[in-house]
Structures are given as structure tokens and as C-alpha cells.
């Protein structure tokens, strides 16, 4: 997955996904967390900020320059002013323990290398304050759409006469939970998106994780 691909899809994505598909989850988190500093990891054009715009100090990062341009447009439209930074999520330009909370919606499953996925989550833990919480979503390997696709599909996106392909690493609940624990987070809960209404969670489209950096955590862990 390259910056160029996300730069290309940014205009269409701005119109296609103008509202977060996790509005219910983010509403609950805004109430749970109440106020503080919040980092949006892989913020794209910014719809996942909306639930936090009134009571939080907002920061957003993305490696796509064009996505961040649309995030400025989006935040201006809805009357909030996040600090937006272009960077690599594997090397965050923030001090240790800088943020009270974080969200990362549909971000880490775009990282192809296993070690780099862990590195990115270790960076997230580093910039969270001890006791700080993060909400992470990942695509589920066992959603019906990908039953026969393997763990690493490429998903097409059409831009006029061009088709670009987005890489995904698909997680099972077990793999997702193992990864965040390996990064040193405490898993509070894992659950499907609110629009999924079946009794067995393992076939949901998304895996949602609420995690916490332990109060006694050491950055070297």
C-alpha cells in the first residue's frame, strides 16, 4: 500500500464515506472518555473526529497528504480544528505519554509486514499516557465476503478509468487480540460493529478492540 494510492482515492473517499460507520461506537467512547487529548491514527479525511469535536483536543495523522487536505476541508465544514500531521504510524512524531486517548479506524490492517504492525502498535502505546485507552478497528478474516480470499486480499477502487488496489491483512478475533496483547496493551473487550446483529461475533465485518495502556507500563516492554 502506497501513499500514491491513498492520494488518488482521497477525493472519491471524501464523498463516499462522509460519515463514520462507527458512529454508535464513537458516541459511546465520547461519553466514556468525556474530555482530554485524542489522537486519530490514520484519520483519512476526518469523519471519525465528529463525536469528539466539542470536548477534546484533537490530533490526526495520516501518511497521505491529499487525505489530510480533505480532513482540513471536512473539519472546516463541521466547525472544528484538529492538529493534522503527515507521518508514518510506525514512527510517530510525538512525545512519550502525549495523549489521553486514541482511535485507529481501519488503519493497521493496511500494514503488510507482521513486525511492522507490531511496531506501529508499540508506537501507539508509547504516545498514550499510562491508563490511556484506544479504540481500534480491523477487517475480519471470517466475514462472508472473504471466506475464500485468504488473509491478504487486494480490494479494488475505481477512479474514473483507472482501478487501484488496496492491500488488507485480515485478522481473526484471536489474532487481533494476540497482537494488541503482544504490544503490551490490556484488552478491555473485543466486539463486532453495532450494525452486526447475529449472535456469533466471529463473522462480523469488523473487529473492534478497546484497549488500555497499563498504569504500570514501561516503554521498554
Question: Predicted segment positions?
Answer:
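Active-site acidic-Proline motif in GNAT/NAT acetyltransferases
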Residues: 65, 96, 109, 113
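Active-site phosphate/pyrophosphate-handling residues
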Residues: 4, 106, 119
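A short glycine-rich, Lys/Arg-flanked "PGG" loop and its adjoining helix->strand segment in the class I
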Residues: 118-130
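Short, amphipathic alpha-helix enriched in basic
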Residues: 73-76, 100, 104
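Class I (Rossmann-like) S-adenosyl-L-methionine-dependent methyltransferase catalytic domain
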Residues: 1-35, 39, 44-91, 115, ...
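A short SAM/SAH-binding and catalytic strip from SAM-dependent methyltransferases
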Residues: 101-115
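A short acidic, Gly/Pro-enriched loop at the edge of an enzyme's catalytic core
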Residues: 90-102
Amino acid at each position: 500500500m502506497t501513499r500514491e494510492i491513498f492520494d488518488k482515492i482521497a477525493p472519491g473517499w471524501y464523498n463516499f464515506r462522509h460519515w463514520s460507520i462507527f458512529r454508535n461506537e464513537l458516541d459511546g467512547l465520547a461519553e466514556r472518555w468525556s474530555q482530554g487529548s485524542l489522537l486519530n491514527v490514520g484519520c483519512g479525511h476526518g469523519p471519525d473526529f465528529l463525536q469528539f469535536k466539542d470536548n477534546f483536543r484533537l490530533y490526526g495523522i495520516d501518511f497521505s497528504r491529499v487525505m489530510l487536505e480533505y480532513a482540513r476541508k471536512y473539519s472546516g465544514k463541521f466547525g472544528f480544528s484538529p492538529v493534522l500531521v503527515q507521518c508514518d504510524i510506525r514512527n510517530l512524531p510525538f512525545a512519550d505519554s502525549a495523549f489521553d486517548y486514541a482511535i485507529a479506524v481501519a488503519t493497521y490492517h493496511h500494514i503488510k509486514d507482521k513486525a511492522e504492525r507490531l511496531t506501529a502498535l508499540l508506537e501507539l502505546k508509547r504516545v498514550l499516557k499510562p491508563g490511556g485507552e484506544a479504540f481500534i478497528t480491523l477487517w475480519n478474516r471470517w466475514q462472508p465476503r472473504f471466506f475464500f480470499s485468504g488473509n491478504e486480499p487486494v480490494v479494488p477502487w475505481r477512479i474514473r478509468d483507472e482501478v487501484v488496489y488496496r492491500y488488507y491483512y485480515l485478522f481473526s478475533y484471536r489474532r487481533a487480540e494476540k497482537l494488541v496483547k503482544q504490544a503490551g496493551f490490556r484488552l478491555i473487550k473485543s466486539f463486532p460493529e453495532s450494525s452486526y446483529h447475529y449472535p456469533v461475533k466471529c463473522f462480523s465485518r469488523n473487529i473492534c478492540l478497546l484497549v488500555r495502556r497499563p498504569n504500570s507500563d514501561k516503554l521498554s516492554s
